[in-house]
Amino acid sequence: MEPELDKLLGASIARTDDGKENDMRPRTLDPTKTGEEAEALEFGLRSKIIGQEDAIHQVVEMYQTYLSGMSSPGRPIANLMFLGPTGSGKTRLVEATAECLLQNAGAVIKIDCAEFQHGHEIAKLIGSPPGYLGHRETKPVLTQEALDQYHTPTVKLSIVLFDEIEKASDTLWNLMLGILDKATLTLGDNTKVDFSKAMIFMTSNVGAWEMSALTKPRLGFARLVENCEIGRSGIEAARRKFTPEFINRIDKMVVFRSLGANELNRILDIELNYVRQRVLKADDGLLFGFAVTAAGKQFLLNEGTNVEYGARHLKRAIERFVVQPLSRLIASGQILNGDFIEIDCGPQASALTFSRQDEGLPVREMARFADLAALSQAAFATVA
């Protein structure tokens, strides 16, 4: 059989169905290329998540494998654990994946593992077994109906997030063994839940202190070595925390690195555009546009940069120095429909200033500003 196969593979001349000869020469294939749907997911994630290319790559790879029908049978689409310091974008990447695939950032079945620090609390997930108090009175969280609730006509998959998995008890980890390995969960009433169409994400801050200790400024070529050390430190911390049976069922552990000044600068533009979209979707009917000057952005970066807290600290700075002042200007009647506001930094760089640059702008013009900002962010992310 093997000689015949070798002869078939080595043949340079083949015949088509109509008997004509066809020159069939070996061609080198490119396994690095992805399909259109996976490319669209990658483009969407890169426009929303900054500085975490490895994590984006892993999500896209798992999704591409699922689309091609090559996923391991009887297992979830992906079992990914995200490690790294707080504010580095672990949860945000999961939400962005849901936003890109299901058109809804809230389409994530989120399990806050801090609520399961004791073994008996697992009943909230799977329900109480027959004969126990509360059986059939409360609905389990992880039912098949709950798992499938965000399916769309074109995308039939679920996104499940076990947030801060290290805070859960061993009982939850043991319960997850069947989900991660066999894509099956048995509820208290003995019904089965199928996770074969689910992407399982786990986030953890375990090892964050050790990783942050490695991010101190260094000289020379230490940057590449530093990233390797950070990844190794995070994974070793996870191996010390979780059991080998649990670790062995995870497809990939991805370490998120701390965000630098360049990443925070790009995140600032994304978050400001989210504020613009919030204005356009406001229920009170007051529509206006705004822009932040380079000096204003630098002020926000100065106030919002904290290596320990990552992007969350920057978001708090935007809420404090942009959103809350805009809210006061709206409430006091100083901002009207169609106004365009410029946000600049004061002469002493101690506060932001707000000035009306235009008024009476049509809604489509203000919407265009938000769309252009989003497009520029996506283009910049693609180039980077």
Could you say what each language-model-derived stretch is?
Residues 1-384:
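AAA+ P-loop NTPase nucleotide-binding core of proteostasis motors
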